[in-house]
Amino acid sequence: MNFFQAIILAIAQGVSELFPISSVAHSVIIPYLFGWKLSPFFLKTNFLEFVVMMHIGTTISLIVYFRKDWKKMLKSLFNKKTSKRNLALIVIGTIPAIILGAIFEQTITNAFSDVIVASIFLIFNGLLLFFGEQTKKRGNKSIEDLKGWQALVIGCFQSLALIPGFSRSGSSITAGFWMGLSNEESARFSMLLSTPMVAGAATLEIPKLIKNHVPGLLSLSLIGGIVAGLAAFLSIYILMHWFNHKKNNTMLPFAIYCIVIGIGVLASKAI
């Protein structure tokens, strides 16, 4: 992997991890479009340090952007403020992904990390976003209004991201719509849910990283982490402002993008 490939992959990671367009699908599709031999399995086997640093960069951006939320929630552990309830809802929402990820992630990744399969599920992701937009409740609930079972449902939808092509944020934002959250609160809850998941993904790989450190990869990995972090921060800023100011058809552009890219890649494979 060269410098140019590292920059492109880092930007793609930072943007697609938080935009509802599936980071895993893009990690499969982008190397295919550029003609690179860099599958997710290859990256995890040979460039694990780079992958971990991209996740760390994204995690730092999430924490920095939502630092006020996390500060309130951590302080709430020592009092009876509403923020304690928000923290509990986030914990509940992460349970499905932790359980299902521990059981099925490796199997699913090995089975579905294929350009054709990723493109098919990217189309399904677009259809989910479109259907979610058309059927959302136009709610005005805030995060603290959620019941425990509703947070669990949103967490279950987030688990769809284990399948390459489905977006973690797209699935959880759509579920948030169905649970009656407002546009901005649905996006906020999705981002807050993403933080422990992305951080956990990096943490789980650290023991492998220590064992299989590749000499000379540190500088490329640091650059990848910084670029992914900056791209992620900008993506969060754009996404939150988008959901705050636009009340209708919020998911439609992302749905169209996923469907068009998925169909385009499938068509290129068929030619």
Curated annotation (Swiss-Prot):
<keyword id="KW-1003">Cell membrane</keyword>
<keyword id="KW-0046">Antibiotic resistance</keyword>
<protein>
    <recommendedName>
        <fullName>Undecaprenyl-diphosphatase 2</fullName>
        <ecNumber>3.6.1.27</ecNumber>
    </recommendedName>
</protein>
<keyword id="KW-1133">Transmembrane helix</keyword>
<feature type="transmembrane region" description="Helical">
    <location>
        <begin position="251"/>
        <end position="271"/>
    </location>
</feature>
<dbReference type="GO" id="GO:0050380">
    <property type="term" value="F:undecaprenyl-diphosphatase activity"/>
</dbReference>
<dbReference type="Pfam" id="PF02673">
    <property type="entry name" value="BacA"/>
</dbReference>
<keyword id="KW-0378">Hydrolase</keyword>
<dbReference type="GO" id="GO:0005886">
    <property type="term" value="C:plasma membrane"/>
</dbReference>
<dbReference type="GO" id="GO:0008360">
    <property type="term" value="P:regulation of cell shape"/>
</dbReference>
<keyword id="KW-0472">Membrane</keyword>
<feature type="transmembrane region" description="Helical">
    <location>
        <begin position="46"/>
        <end position="66"/>
    </location>
</feature>
<dbReference type="GO" id="GO:0071555">
    <property type="term" value="P:cell wall organization"/>
</dbReference>
<dbReference type="GO" id="GO:0009252">
    <property type="term" value="P:peptidoglycan biosynthetic process"/>
</dbReference>
<dbReference type="InterPro" id="IPR003824">
    <property type="entry name" value="UppP"/>
</dbReference>
<feature type="transmembrane region" description="Helical">
    <location>
        <begin position="220"/>
        <end position="240"/>
    </location>
</feature>
<feature type="transmembrane region" description="Helical">
    <location>
        <begin position="88"/>
        <end position="108"/>
    </location>
</feature>
<feature type="transmembrane region" description="Helical">
    <location>
        <begin position="1"/>
        <end position="21"/>
    </location>
</feature>
<feature type="transmembrane region" description="Helical">
    <location>
        <begin position="111"/>
        <end position="131"/>
    </location>
</feature>
<comment type="similarity">
    <text>Belongs to the UppP family.</text>
</comment>
<keyword id="KW-0573">Peptidoglycan synthesis</keyword>
<feature type="transmembrane region" description="Helical">
    <location>
        <begin position="146"/>
        <end position="166"/>
    </location>
</feature>
<comment type="function">
    <text>Catalyzes the dephosphorylation of undecaprenyl diphosphate (UPP). Confers resistance to bacitracin.</text>
</comment>
<feature type="transmembrane region" description="Helical">
    <location>
        <begin position="190"/>
        <end position="210"/>
    </location>
</feature>
<dbReference type="GO" id="GO:0046677">
    <property type="term" value="P:response to antibiotic"/>
</dbReference>
<keyword id="KW-0961">Cell wall biogenesis/degradation</keyword>
<keyword id="KW-0812">Transmembrane</keyword>
<keyword id="KW-0133">Cell shape</keyword>
